[in-house]
């Protein structure tokens, strides 16, 4: 299975002016933990890191330390996640029929989750890892006034990996460019094009490291795995 890792973001909410994936959790950069999970996932055979060239020297140094056995390629990132993934799709080997897309900042996803998504995408056109929402969600207007309360039983929190048929996803991205759609994940492009996206049960610990608090939580989770 082919894996694309969007890794081009700057950690503004992290309070830093460089790529947040270079910040460390337990003496390893965030991106290193993501790559180690991909290395350990038996279904993953190829990894594409979508990032800015200014980060490539640091990423290459990390790769040298990790000594991964799977092929890794660097792909030029865009100005948005959507544009970055589009670039990643164009860089896939021609043999790629399905692809997984996994946020570099979701460094706690386990090899088992990557494998489950890789196996499931062979039997559908699109999928996302997701978990049921536990909190009650309120829809509010621009003045902060509650408008309605959706039924929590129908709400799932989207995660990554997200998996897709490569040709269909390329078509959806092309349509998104034509229509001027701006989306925050690839499943939304499938939805806008009327293509079904299935759910694969995600992991409660599969958080996206975005804030300093997330760094502390990630360290706690990694420590707990060592002690289990």
Curated annotation (Swiss-Prot):
What class does this enzyme belong to in the EC scheme?
transferase
The cross-references to SUPFAM superfamilies, in alphabetical order and at most eight, read: Nucleotide-diphospho-sugar transferases
Record-marked site positions (Transition state stabilizer): 13, 20
TM annotation in the entry: none
Keywords of this entry: Isoprene biosynthesis, Nucleotidyltransferase, Transferase
GO BP annotation list: isopentenyl diphosphate biosynthetic process, methylerythritol 4-phosphate pathway
Q: In which pathway does it act?
A: Isoprenoid biosynthesis; isopentenyl diphosphate biosynthesis via DXP pathway; isopentenyl diphosphate from 1-deoxy-D-xylulose 5-phosphate: step 2/6
Identify the CDD domains for this entry.
CDP-ME_synthetase
The family database entries (Pfam families) matched by this protein are listed as: IspD (PF01128)
What InterPro entries does this protein map onto?
IspD, IspD/TarI, IspD/TarI_cytidylyltransf_bact, ISPD_synthase_CS, Nucleotide-diphossugar_trans
Query: What reaction gets catalysed by this protein?
Result: 2-C-methyl-D-erythritol 4-phosphate + CTP + H(+) = 4-CDP-2-C-methyl-D-erythritol + diphosphate
Might you give the EC number(s) for this enzyme?
A: 2.7.7.60
Any keyword Aminoacyl-tRNA synthetase?
no
Tell me where on the tree of life, at the top rank, the source sits. Bacteria
Q: Which Gene3D superfamilies match?
A: Spore Coat Polysaccharide Biosynthesis Protein SpsA, Chain A
Site note Positions MEP for the nucleophilic attack applies to 152, 208
Entry's Gene Ontology molecular function annotations: 2-C-methyl-D-erythritol 4-phosphate cytidylyltransferase activity
Q: Which cysteines are joined by disulfide bonds?
A: none
* UniProt keyword Transferase, yes or no: yes
PANTHER family for the chain: 2-C-METHYL-D-ERYTHRITOL 4-PHOSPHATE CYTIDYLYLTRANSFERASE, CHLOROPLASTIC
> What family does the database annotate?
Belongs to the IspD/TarI cytidylyltransferase family. IspD subfamily.
What this chain does, per the entry, is described as:
Catalyzes the formation of 4-diphosphocytidyl-2-C-methyl-D-erythritol from CTP and 2-C-methyl-D-erythritol 4-phosphate (MEP).
* Name of this chain's protein: 2-C-methyl-D-erythritol 4-phosphate cytidylyltransferase
What is the primary gene name for this protein? ispD
């Amino acid at each position: 299975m082919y894996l694309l890792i969007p890794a081009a973001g700057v950690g503004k909410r992290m309070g830093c002016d460089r790529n947040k994936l270079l910040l460390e959790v337990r003496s390893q950069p965030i991106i290193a933990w993501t790559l180690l999970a991909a290395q350990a996932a038996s279904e993953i055979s190829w990894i594409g890191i979508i990032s800015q060239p200014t980060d490539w020297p640091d990423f290459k140094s990390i790769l040298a330390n990790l000594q991964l056995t799977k092929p890794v390629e660097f792909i030029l990132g865009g100005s948005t996640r959507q544009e970055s993934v589009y670039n990643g799709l164009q860089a896939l080997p021609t043999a790629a029929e399905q692809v997984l897309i996994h946020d570099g900042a979701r460094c706690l996803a386990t090899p088992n989750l990557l494998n489950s998504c890789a196996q499931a995408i062979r039997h559908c056109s699109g999928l996302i890892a997701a978990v049921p929402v536990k909190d009650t969600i309120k829809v509010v207007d621009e003045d902060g006034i509650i408008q309605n309360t959706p039924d929590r039983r129908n709400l799932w929190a989207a995660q990554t990996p997200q998996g897709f048929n490569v040709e269909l996803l390329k078509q959806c991205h092309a349509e998104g460019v034509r229509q001027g759609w701006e989306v925050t994940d690839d499943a939304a492009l499938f939805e806008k094009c009327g293509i079904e996206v299935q759910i694969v049960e995600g992991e409660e610990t599969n958080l996206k490291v975005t804030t300093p608090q997330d760094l502390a939580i990630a360290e706690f989770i990694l420590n707990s795995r060592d002690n289990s």
